[in-house]
């Protein structure tokens, strides 16, 4: 009669949390579970049935302590409203949120939506997402079950809808990757599907990105290129990973050098509103370009040498500003001027300095600087240090 009873026998459930209205068939729940414990009492059953019949649809609650006792130690019943208006929906949501106070780290949850309102399963998914992603309780959803009682077969099939919840996890991971470059959630999901090697590559990519390791980032980006073809031959990831990985790689499709990779990454940071990272990466791209242009090996000493050269050119430009403002600047002067102005903004960001301009002006300035630098780098201008 109740799928919950079959779930109990199959999975050996510790405790039940039942959710329903004052008009739900609580007397049948009592009958089913108390009979299994040989504690059924006819008078209790009749009294409960009468109370349910006499209670109006707007009744706040009825006494269901006998049902909780029949369900077993630790079990709890939550009585909700019909949800016919916003006030009742909010009331129901608050009831659901109380579950977050009871669930504990390590709990394994089996959800039965067979006898519920259609809206209850939606509530449950919202609450479980809240528990896992906001208050961060380590719980595991083992199954989301629906008993197809309308089937004409003598044996009624039970469908596990856990795949819906898993898809929500994939969507969450996709959002983290798309907006922040964080692949950790997706890496965990990929690993669960048995792809340990590519889970490691995903984590390495995000580690390099978040640490700002420009030297290894080009290699990490290249490691993503065949991810959608190799990693996921089946499974939910096939619906998510190709889209987000290809959207990210689109930024780098024309990048042939390390400096171009860094330049394009600065634009990706900007488009995803990580403005500090965008300035940092644009500056690093300009230094890398300077090393490439001078045919320097890209190491610390040569990068410092390149920075000093650009600062010296800008310093000379400023020293003779009254004369220079009437002539066309060389490519080296324009490039060095932008680099030094970016350095000032970056230092203000990094050291919480007193900015001479508003934040919005610095954000707008990035696009101007990016477009100018991009144009010069694409033309492969020659820098004269």
For every predicted segment, state its role.
Residues 29-106:
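A broadly used, surface-exposed interaction patch
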Residues 224-336:
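Polyanion-binding interface signature
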Residues 1-61, 377-384:
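N-terminal extension/subdomain marker
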Residues 118-135:
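Short Gly/Thr/Asp-enriched flexible loops that form oxyanion-binding sites at enzyme active sites
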Residues 326-361:
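Histidine-centered, metal-coordinating catalytic motifs and their short helical/loop contexts
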Residues 158-257:
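Long, charge-rich alpha-helical interaction segments
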Residues 363-385:
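Amphipathic, Lys/Arg-enriched alpha-helical patches that create a basic surface
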Residues 135-165:
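Catalytic or ion-translocation cores adjacent to nucleophile or general acid/base/metal-coordination motifs
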């Amino acid at each position: 009669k109740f799928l919950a009873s079959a779930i109990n026998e199959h999975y050996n459930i510790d405790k039940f949390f039942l959710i329903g209205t004052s008009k739900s068939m609580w007397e049948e729940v009592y009958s089913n579970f108390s009979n299994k414990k040989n504690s059924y009492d006819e008078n209790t059953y009749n009294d409960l049935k009468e109370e349910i019949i006499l209670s109006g649809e707007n009744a706040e609650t009825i006494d269901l302590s006998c049902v909780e006792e029949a369900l077993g130690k630790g079990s709890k019943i939550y009585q909700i409203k019909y949800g016919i208006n916003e006030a009742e929906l909010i009331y129901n949501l608050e009831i659901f949120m109380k579950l977050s106070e009871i669930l504990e780290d390590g709990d394994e949850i089996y959800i039965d939506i067979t006898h519920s309102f259609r809206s209850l399963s939606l509530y449950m998914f919202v609450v479980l997402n809240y528990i896992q992603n906001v208050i961060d309780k380590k719980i595991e959803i083992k199954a989301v079950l629906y008993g197809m009682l309308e089937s004409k077969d003598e044996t009624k099939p039970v469908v596990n809808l856990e795949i819906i919840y898993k898809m929500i996890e994939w969507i969450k991971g996709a959002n983290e990757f798309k907006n922040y470059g964080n692949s950790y959630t997706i890496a965990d999901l990929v690993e669960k599907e048995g792809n340990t090697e590519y889970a490691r590559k995903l984590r390495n990519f995000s580690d390099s990105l978040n640490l700002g390791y420009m030297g290894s980032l080009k290699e990490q980006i290249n490691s993503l290129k065949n991810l959608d073809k190799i990693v996921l031959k089946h499974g939910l990831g096939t619906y998510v990973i190709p889209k987000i990985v290809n959207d990210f790689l689109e930024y780098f499709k024309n990048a042939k050098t390390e400096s171009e990779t860094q330049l394009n990454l600065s634009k990706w940071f900007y488009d995803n509103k990580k403005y500090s990272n965008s300035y940092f990466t644009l500056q690093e791209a300009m230094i890398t370009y300077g090393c490439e242009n001078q045919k320097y090996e890209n190491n610390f000493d040569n990068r410092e040498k390149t920075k000093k050269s650009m600062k010296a050119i800008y310093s000379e430009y400023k020293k003779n500003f009254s004369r220079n403002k009437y002539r066309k600047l060389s490519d080296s002067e324009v490039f060095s001027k932008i680099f030094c102005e970016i350095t000032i903004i970056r230092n203000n960001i990094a050291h919480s300095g007193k900015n001479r301009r508003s934040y919005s002006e610095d954000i707008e300035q990035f696009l101007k600087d990016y477009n100018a630098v991009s144009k010069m780098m694409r033309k492969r201008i020659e820098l004269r240090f």
